[in-house]
C-alpha cells in the first residue's frame, strides 16, 4: 500500500517512541542497456508503512542499486548509486559541465567503489594515521561555521563500473568501461548534458542549502571518470522522510552520468586525507535519533528478482536462515588502529568438482572487501586458476575470462566460503555464470590485481548472504540468505547485535518458507516501535 498522506507521516514521525530502522527497498529492472530502461516498469514499486521501520527502495541492473533522493527546499529529484564500498554522497549540479573521461589509459581495473587506490599510499596512510579515533568527527554546527579548511581531493577510491576484460590471461589485465568512447568514462556524455538524465540539484533554488567554505570537492575513479564540485549541506528527503542538514558534494563538472550515495566507513570519506571525517548518511541517521546504531542489513535477493532491501538500524529475521555470526572487520593499514574499508577475513573457499570431490582453493586466510558497487567478484590469480580448473573452465584470450560449460547455469553445486573461520556461506555456482552469447558462458569471477592487498566480493557472491554491517563496532554479521517476501523486522539497540536466529528456511528448489522465530534477548528491541517506512525507488542496470 502506498502512503499518500504527508500529514499522517508527520504525525507518526512526531510520535516516535523509540529508535526506528530506516529501510531501503530496491526494485530490480533489467534491459539491454541503460537507454532502454524507462522510469516506468511493469513492476510497481511498493511504498509501505511498517511500525519501527523506514523503507528505502533500491533497483538492481548490472549491478547498480539506485536510490531516488529529493534534495533541498525545492525537492530536486536525484537518482544515485547506493554503494557500500564508498562513503560520500555527491550529486549533479543543474548546470554542470559533462566531459569525456580519458580513455587512453587502460592499465588499471575498475573494481567498484572503494577500491583501486591510486593516491600515494604512504602519504594517504600518514594522513589517516594522524586522524583522531573515528569518534572525532566534524559536526554539522562546525560545518556551518566553516571551521574546516580542507581540499577535498581523492584519487582512485574505486570505479562506478566493474566490467573487466582480461586480455592476456591471468597475470595481466586491461579495462573496458561500457561507455568509454561512446558516452565517456562511466556514462559521461562527451559534452552534452545527458549526464543529468538521472537528476540534478539547483542550489540557488533551495532556501535551506548552505555551501561549505572549503576548497573544491574532487574525486577520480580507477576507470578515469571523475567529479569536481563544491561541498555543502541541505535537507535530503527519501520518500516522505527528511534527513536534515546532510553533508554532500555537488558536482559542477563530471565524466559520470550518475551520482553516488556512499554508505561505507567514515575512514573512506574523501576528507580523511585532510585530517577529519564527517557524518555520512548512516552516521547522520544515528546522530539525528532515527536509528540507535550506525548499522544496516543488506538483502540483495535472487539474481532475477525485482526487489531487495537495505535496512538501517534493524534486522529482518525472515531474510536469513540459521544463526547470524559476527566477524570483526580487518584493519586496512597496520599503522591505523581501525578499519578503513569493509573488509573481512575469508579462511576457506571450497569448490565442489563435477566428480563430487571438494577442494579448498584458498591457500591462506585472505582479506575480502564486500562491495555492492561491483557486479562481479575479484580474486587473486592462484585462486582464480584453481576455481577455473575445478569448474573445468578454459581461459579465453578473446573473451578475456574463463569460459565454462553453460550447463553450470543450471547446476546445484556450490562454492562454500568460510568467513572468519566460523561461518560458511554457500554460493550457487549458477550465480557465478554469465551468458556471454547463445552458446558461450563465462565465469563472473575475475582476477584481482597482484598489487592489491585484498580480494573483492561483488553482488554475484553477496546475494547468497544476509549481511549486517555495523559501522560503529567495525563488525559484519553474516547468515545464509533466505529468499522470501515475508518480513520479521526488529530494531537493534545501541548495544548492538547478540546471537540471533533467522526465521526463514530455504527449500531445495530455492523457495522460502517461514518457521517460528527465535530472537535473542539483550539489544534486540522486541516491543512495538513507532517509526516510518521510507520507500525509495532504486534502479539497477544490467548492461549486456
UniProtKB/Swiss-Prot annotation:
| Top-level class of the enzyme under EC nomenclature | hydrolase
> According to the Swiss-Prot or TrEMBL entry, at which residues is a lipid covalently attached (GPI-anchor amidated serine)?
520
- Its main localization is membrane
Record note on modification: The GPI-anchor is attached to the protein in the endoplasmic reticulum and serves to target the protein to the cell surface. There, the glucosamine-inositol phospholipid moiety is cleaved off and the GPI-modified mannoprotein is covalently attached via its lipidless GPI glycan remnant to the 1,6-beta-glucan of the outer cell wall layer.
Residue span(s) of the pro-peptide: 521-544
Q: What induces it?
A: Induced by fluconazole. Expression is regulated by growth phase, temperature, and white-opaque switch.
Q: Which reaction does it catalyse?
A: Preferential cleavage at the carboxyl of hydrophobic amino acids, but fails to cleave 15-Leu-|-Tyr-16, 16-Tyr-|-Leu-17 and 24-Phe-|-Phe-25 of insulin B chain. Activates trypsinogen, and degrades keratin
Sites where the protein binds pepstatin A: 83-85, 371-375
| Residues the record marks as carrying a glycan | 212, 240, 252, 422, 499
Cite the GO molecular-function annotations of the record. aspartic-type endopeptidase activity
Query: Where does this one sit in the cell?
Result: Cell membrane; Secreted, Cell wall
UniProt note: pH dependence: Optimum pH is 5.5 using casein-resorufin as substrate, and 6.0-7.0, the pH of the saliva, for cleavage of Hst 5.
Its membrane topology: Lipid-anchor; GPI-anchor
Q: Which GO terms describe its cellular component?
A: cell surface; extracellular region; extracellular vesicle; fungal-type cell wall; membrane; plasma membrane; side of membrane
Region: Disordered, residue numbers: 31-50, 500-519
List the disulfide bonds in this chain. 98-195, 406-441
The entry's keywords:
Aspartyl protease, Cell membrane, Cell wall, Cleavage on pair of basic residues, Disulfide bond, Glycoprotein, GPI-anchor, Hydrolase, Lipoprotein, Membrane, Protease, Repeat, Secreted, Signal, Transmembrane, Transmembrane helix, Virulence, Zymogen
Protein family membership: Belongs to the peptidase A1 family.
Q: What does this protein do?
A: Secreted aspartic peptidases (SAPs) are a group of ten acidic hydrolases considered as key virulence factors. These enzymes supply the fungus with nutrient amino acids as well as are able to degrade the selected host's proteins involved in the immune defense. Moreover, acts toward human hemoglobin though limited proteolysis to generate a variety of antimicrobial hemocidins, enabling to compete with the other microorganisms of the same physiological niche using the microbicidal peptides generated from the host protein.
Q: What is this protein called?
A: Secreted aspartic protease 9
Species of origin reads Candida albicans (strain SC5314 / ATCC MYA-2876)
Amino acid at each position: 500500500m502506498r502512503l499518500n498522506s504527508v500529514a499522517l507521516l508527520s504525525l507518526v514521525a512526531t510520535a516516535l517512541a523509540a529508535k526506528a530502522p530506516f529501510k531501503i527497498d530496491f526494485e530490480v529492472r533489467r534491459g539491454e542497456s541503460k537507454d532502454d530502461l524507462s522510469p516506468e516498469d511493469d513492476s510497481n514499486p511498493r511504498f509501505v508503512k511498517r511500525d519501527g521501520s523506514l523503507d528505502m527502495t533500491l533497483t538492481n541492473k548490472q549491478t547498480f542499486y539506485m536510490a531516488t533522493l529529493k534534495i533541498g527546499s525545492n525537492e530536486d529529484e536525484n537518482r544515485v548509486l547506493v554503494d557500500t564500498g564508498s562513503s560520500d554522497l555527491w550529486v549533479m549540479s543543474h548546470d554542470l559541465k559533462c566531459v569525456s573521461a580519458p580513455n587512453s589509459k587502460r592499465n588499471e581495473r575498475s573494481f567498484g567503489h572503494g577500491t583501486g587506490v591510486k593516491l600515494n599510499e604512504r602519504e594517504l596512510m600518514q594522513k589517516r594515521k594522524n586522524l583522531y579515533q573515528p569518534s572525532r568527527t566534524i559536526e554539522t554546527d562546525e560545518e556551518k561555521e566553516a571551521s574546516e579548511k580542507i581540499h577535498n581531493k581523492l584519487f582512485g577510491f574505486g570505479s562506478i563500473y566493474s566490467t573487466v576484460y582480461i586480455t592476456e590471461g591471468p597475470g595481466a589485465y586491461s579495462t573496458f568501461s561500457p561507455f568509454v568512447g561512446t558516452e565517456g568514462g562511466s556514462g559521461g556524455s562527451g559534452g552534452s548534458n545527458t549526464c543529468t538524465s538521472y537528476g540534478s540539484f539547483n542550489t540557488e533554488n533551495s532556501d535551506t542549502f548552505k555551501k561549505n567554505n572549503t576548497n573544491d570537492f574532487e574525486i577520480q575513479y580507477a576507470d578515469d571518470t571523475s567529479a569536481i564540485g563544491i561541498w555543502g549541506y541541505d535537507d535530503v528527503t527519501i520518500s516522505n522522510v527528511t534527513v536534515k542538514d546532510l553533508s554532500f558534494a555537488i558536482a559542477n563538472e563530471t565524466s559520470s552520468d550518475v551520482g553516488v550515495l556512499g554508505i561505507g566507513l567514515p575512514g573512506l570519506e574523501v576528507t580523511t586525507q585532510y585530517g577529519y571525517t564527517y557524518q555520512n548518511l548512516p552516521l547522520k541517521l544515528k546522530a539525528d535519533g532515527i536509528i540507535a546504531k550506525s548499522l544496516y542489513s543488506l538483502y540483495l535477493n535472487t539474481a532475477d528478482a525485482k526487489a531487495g532491501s537495505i535496512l538501517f538500524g534493524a534486522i529482518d529475521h525472515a531474510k536469513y536462515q540459521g544463526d547470524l555470526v559476527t566477524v570483526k572487520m580487518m584493519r586496512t593499514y597496520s599503522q591505523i588502529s581501525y578499519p578503513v574499508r569493509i573488509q573481512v577475513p575469508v579462511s576457506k573457499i571450497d569448490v565442489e568438482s563435477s566428480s563430487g570431490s571438494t577442494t579448498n582453493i584458498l591457500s591462506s586466510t585472505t582479506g575480502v572487501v564486500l562491495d555492492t558497487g561491483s557486479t562481479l567478484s575479484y580474486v587473486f590469480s592462484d585462486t582464480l586458476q584453481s576455481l577455473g580448473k575445478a569448474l573445468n573452465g578454459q581461459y579465453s584470450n578473446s573473451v578475456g575470462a574463463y569460459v565454462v560449460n553453460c550447463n553450470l547455469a543450471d547446476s546445484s553445486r556450490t562454492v562454500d566460503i568460510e568467513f572468519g573461520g566460523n561461518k560458511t556461506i554457500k554460493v550457487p555456482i549458477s550465480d557465478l555464470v554469465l551468458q556471454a552469447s547463445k552458446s558461450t558462458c563465462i565465469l563472473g569471477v575475475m582476477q584481482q590485481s597482484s598489487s592489491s592487498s585484498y580480494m573483492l566480493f561483488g553482488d554475484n557472491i553477496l546475494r547468497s548472504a544476509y549481511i549486517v554491517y555495523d559501522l560503529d563496532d567495525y563488525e559484519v554479521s553474516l547468515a545464509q540468505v533466505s529468499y522470501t517476501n515475508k518480513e520479521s523486522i526488529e530494531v537493534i539497540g545501541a548495544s548492538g547485535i547478540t546471537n540471533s536466529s533467522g526465521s526463514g528456511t530455504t527449500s531445495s528448489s530455492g523457495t522460502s518458507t517461514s518457521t517460528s522465530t527465535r530472537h535473542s534477548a539483550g539489544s534486540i528491541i522486541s516491543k512495538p516501535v513507532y517509526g516510518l517506512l521510507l520507500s525509495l525507488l532504486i534502479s539497477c542496470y544490467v548492461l549486456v
